[in-house]
A protein has these predicted regions:
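Mature catalytic core of soluble alpha/beta enzymes
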Residues: 2-227
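Single conserved hydrophobic/aromatic residue that forms the stacking wall/gate
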Residues: 225-236
Length: 236
């Protein structure tokens, strides 16, 4: 049997093949931005695949909201906020993600010789930068600093079995500002990989993670802005 294919059909197939090749070789950057976690976020995806930008935004914002309700020490309904507010030495059951971050923080604390210390929350509050801090017009006294320091120490938070954590001091508080954003960025990256993206850049509050080779195949390039100097009149 002879198979006759119209010439116009061959041309259409050829054009479609060319179009697909062109798109693959010249992927575009799709960018989403927003505010969450008390800061700004940005996601850049380099892809040649058609997808719903709004559906991706919805997934990202839902993930950010989910993480904020776990790691925030500002919002009353957050797991961390409630842990900090529990003035007790009775073992407390905490969210698995919060427990994982606490375990990792203990490891970093050990590796850094105690320099990284999430129990620094009382000091942060004393200087007016925490959720219960007050705007200060004077420097805290040595006595105030000493009292706040007495409430710190990773040795004062104990990991127990079955996801339980015990404070050895009821007033002990945790501040994961130095690590939570990195954990959340990792979760956003996992989300993007679930969308089958393999070339993207995620930034939350100045913390960045890149995946893939970027637009030119040499990796993503991030620029660092120079901080203002006193002579600019921006610092006192």
């Amino acid at each position: 049997m002879n198979l006759h294919i119209p010439v116009f059909l061959i041309i259409i197939i050829w054009l479609c093949g060319c179009a697909e090749t062109t798109i693959t070789e010249n992927p575009s950057i799709c960018e989403l931005k927003g505010k969450a976690l008390g800061t700004t976020w940005s996601v850049k995806v380099l892809t040649a695949t058609d997808f719903s930008l709004e559906d991706l935004r919805t997934d990202i914002t839902q993930k950010l909201e989910e993480c904020d309700k776990i790691f925030s020490h500002w919002r009353p309904d957050a797991e961390l906020y409630q842990f900090n507010g529990a003035l007790t030495t009775t073992p407390i059951s905490i969210h698995p993600q919060l427990l994982t971050l606490l375990k990792h923080s203990k490891w970093i604390h050990k590796q850094s010789g105690g320099t990284f210390d999430p129990t620094i929350a009382p000091i942060v509050n004393l200087w007016g930068f925490g959720p219960v801090g007050k705007t200060r017009s004077t420097i805290p006294t040595d006595k105030q600093i000493g009292e706040a320091l007495s409430l710190t120490g990773m040795n004062k938070v104990e990991l127990l079995r079955k996801g339980l954590v015990r404070k050895k001091l009821p007033a002990l508080q945790l501040d994961f500002s130095g690590s939570a954003k990195g954990e959340i960025i990792d979760q956003i990256c996992t989300l993007l990989q679930g969308w089958n993206f393999n070339n993207f850049l995620v930034e939350i509050g100045g913390e960045v993670r890149a995946h893939g080779k970027g637009r030119n195949g040499k990796g993503w390039v991030c620029l660092l802005y120079t901080s203002p100097s006193p002579r600019d009149g921006l610092l006192s």
